[in-house]
Amino acid sequence: MKTRQNKYSIRKFSVGASSILIAALLFMGGGSAQAAEQQQDKGTVENSTTQSIGDGNEKLSEQQSTQNKNVNEKSNVNSITENESLHNETPKNEDWIQQQKDSQNDNKSESVVEQNKENEAFVQNHSEEKPQQEQVELEKHASENNQTLHSKAAQSNEDVKTKPSQLDNTAAKQEDSQKENLSKQDTQSSKTTDLLRATAQNQSKDSQSTEEINKEVNNDTQQVTAKNDDAKVESFNLNSKEEPLKVDKQANPTTDKDKSSKNDKGSQDGLANLESNAVATTNKQSKQQVSEKNEDQTNKSAKQKQYKNNDPIILVHGFNGFTDDINPSVLTHYWGGDKMNIRQDLEENGYEAYEASISAFGSNYDRAVELYYYIKGGRVDYGAAHAAKYGHERYGKTYEGVYKDWKPGQKIHLVGHSMGGQTIRQLEELLRHGNPEEVEYQKQHGGEISPLYQGGHDNMVSSITTLGTPHNGTHASDLLGNEAIVRQLAYDVGKMYGNKDSRVDFGLEHWGLKQKPNESYIQYVKRVQNSKLWKSKDSGLHDLTRDGATDLNRKTSLNPNIVYKTYTGESTHKTLAGKQKADLNMFLPFTITGNLIGKAKEKEWRENDGLVSVISSQHPFNQKYVEATDKNQKGVWQVTPTKHDWDHVDFVGQDSTDTKRTRDELQQFWHGLAEDLVQSEQLTSTNK
């Protein structure tokens, strides 16, 4: 009975061992597949582990299938059932395997014959359990297998002895693989948990950082608001540039340190929203505040910190000068010609500058009044007494004003080319002393009077700079400008462009040289023929004569609080006869007048720039002057050295055919002039 139990145990072991081995392989394959599905989103490390386990299982499956060729589909079905129990009762399977090991050790002394019989019984038992077709097939080959088994009895006995050790090794490997797989799963799960915790911590840090930044921005805003008006725009510009960068750096601290956090959609969206909201709020506030401060473009106190010059530069053109919006198409840009835009270049290099738009043919007085309203803004008032004296209308065009807050203490730089130099001198005289005739007229007749004519507006001009200005008049106007035919020609041009369809404006509308809306052109021509303009001295042609300039010099004086400076050019050379002849590079239209001035009776007047004599451009005869040095002075004309080979328009770059005067030279000249104006503010500033 005891022997019978041992045989039964061996047979049971053989069947069970095979079933367990196959079940274990299936379990490992199924477990690996399940683990692979669960870890599909966790990276390539888990995939490579699953693939490695699958490859090992395939090798073990091929080895065991060779040893168990007689085990077929039904055993597989049974093994699947056992696999489910093994999946749920792993400790029991280990105990059972240990019992089988002990039982196998007790049967090591069995003979080869008994082992063969047991193998035959093993085959027969399995044959009885098979379907009918499989049993017939097994019986057919029973005798053949019996002979094979007898011939390999010794080898089979050794195989039986070694099977327990192989099973032990296989089970141990499978167990180690399972533990390793579970360990990796736990490790990956731990990493995921740590990653989520880190993300949560980062979000918490981001929220704290953003709150601190918002507090700092609010504090900075309050501090800037408390500062004086002169520092407002600059402070807000600095905050708007620095604060968004500060938010960008702190609002996303985990970008470089923890790249895996980018895969967390919730964390990424949260950080993105935090960053965008923080930056947008800072920029929006700073932009609105700066926009409010810069809304009034004529408020110098809100703009001056943006420029190198505290006092704006006003460029004033000469006779027959225009701005681009009202000039004839045949004329080039006044300030810079085809070489450059002087005003724009000054702006780009940090200087606040404007181009004045005043009458092209008007007198210095009328042009000075227009210049005042161009800067200050408002409707031009030529004065009741002045209009009645010369026979033109009292009111002219309306200007918007480029510097509405212009008043004593808020100064400007006046730069005049040609006749523009006379005009700015006239304006400064009106600001300081007004017009006594207008004051008396207003007392007698009542009505309104412009503040310009009341005087008492000192400390409104920082400097006066003239370029090729005929301070003492010019022979060109004496000999040609006031000839009847020349005057008629000039005014006919103005009359022609005065039609209602023309955009050209010569600044003679207050003289009636502008066609009315309901007036035909024939009616317009007949009306202007009776204008007093043709014989009036209230015109530019008269003021450019030596008599007209002398009259202006008598009415004007030097202001001790203003820096005066003149720039002069010449473009003629002396002949054997002692006269001056125009150079080859002189602007072609000026060769006639240049040669005419070069033949003047007064030798000191002969050297000229084509329109103005050098002696007339340097300074008014009746006013004090000195040679200019690196150190500026107030209350005296500072005469700069004469620029040789510079004709009348080279100062403003209008001669595009002149190869000697380059754009770089012109730009360098104006940059030096602007820098000198800034230096003069140290002498004239009222904020010392």
Swiss-Prot record:
It comes from the Bacteria. GO terms for biological process: lipid catabolic process. Keywords: Calcium, Hydrolase, Lipid degradation, Lipid metabolism, Metal-binding, Secreted, Signal, Zymogen. Transmembrane segments: none annotated. The keyword Metal-binding applies. Residues 1-35 form the signal peptide. It is an enzyme of class 3 (hydrolase). One of its GO terms (molecular function) is triacylglycerol lipase activity. The active site is at S418, D609, H648. One of its GO terms (cellular component) is extracellular region. Residues 45-54, 144-172, 184-211, 274-289 have a biased composition (Polar residues). Residues 68-79 have a biased composition (Low complexity). PROSITE patterns: LIPASE_SER (PS00120). Ca(2+) binds at D647, D650, D655, D658. Belongs to the AB hydrolase superfamily. Lipase family. This is Lipase.
